[in-house]
Amino acid sequence: LKTAVLLFILLLPCAAPAAESFLEPPRWSLEVKGGMFKPALENWSQNFGDSGMREFAAAFGYKFLQQVELGAGAGLMKSKGQVFNQFHGAPAGDVTYELYPVNIFVMLRGVAVDGQWVVPYVGGGWTRMYYREIFQDGETARGFADGYHVRGGLQISLDGLDQAAANRMFIDYHVYHTFFIIEVESRRVIERSTSINLGGKAYHAGLLFEF
């Protein structure tokens, strides 16, 4: 009996990974990321003295298959500078420029086997870009425009770096897998009344959790 109990205790740490293989594959994902957005606006770098805007974003997704995901996300960006009013053409002095993109997307993932270390992906979909410009004289211009985005990148598994931490994430938070992500995203969003493109190109890095 003592021998049987000892064997049970020794085999217990293997129970969680073994049990996971019999569970349904994870369907939901949470993505948090940040990076640099380079607007397509003319004379952006000259007017704002910077090559881009810092962006922070998050997204939820649902996998119908491990290779096909539907999701939605949102982000925020802000930059300060001294520019002409992009929508009226008059000198504006100091200005704060804000963008808030909202995305609905489909993602195709290159998953061939369970536990794959590197997963390439491409995606795209609809984008609504909310904008706001706050000028020195107190005037505010705001609105939104619709367009589209495309993106591609890599999801790099972090599970193998610390298996004990991965097991704790599964037991405590029901997180099956954690990935480090790097991606490039291109947006084209035309404001109809002015024909200004509120889109541009973004470079992101962050974390993806599957549960």
Label every PLM stretch briefly.
Residues A18-K63, I190-T194, G200, G206-E210:
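Short glycine/proline- and aromatic-enriched beta-strand/turn motifs that initiate or cap beta-hairpins
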Residues A19-W28, Y62-Q67, V111-V119, D159-T178:
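Short loop/turn motifs that connect adjacent beta-strands in outer-membrane beta-barrel proteins
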Residues P26, D50-F56, T96-V102, V118, ...:
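Residues that define the transmembrane beta-barrel architecture of outer-membrane proteins
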Residues W28-V32, Q66-A72, Y100-I104, V118-G124, ...:
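Transmembrane beta-strands of outer-membrane beta-barrel proteins
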Residues V32-G34, A58-Y62, A72, I104-G110, ...:
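Residues on the lipid-exposed face of transmembrane beta-strands in outer-membrane beta-barrel proteins
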Residues G34-A40, A74-K80, G110, W126-R132, ...:
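Transmembrane beta-strands of outer-membrane beta-barrel pores
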Residues A59-Q136:
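Gram-negative (and chloroplast) outer-membrane scaffold detector with strong preference
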Residues Q155-F211:
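Predominantly the C-terminal beta-signal and adjacent terminal strand-loop region
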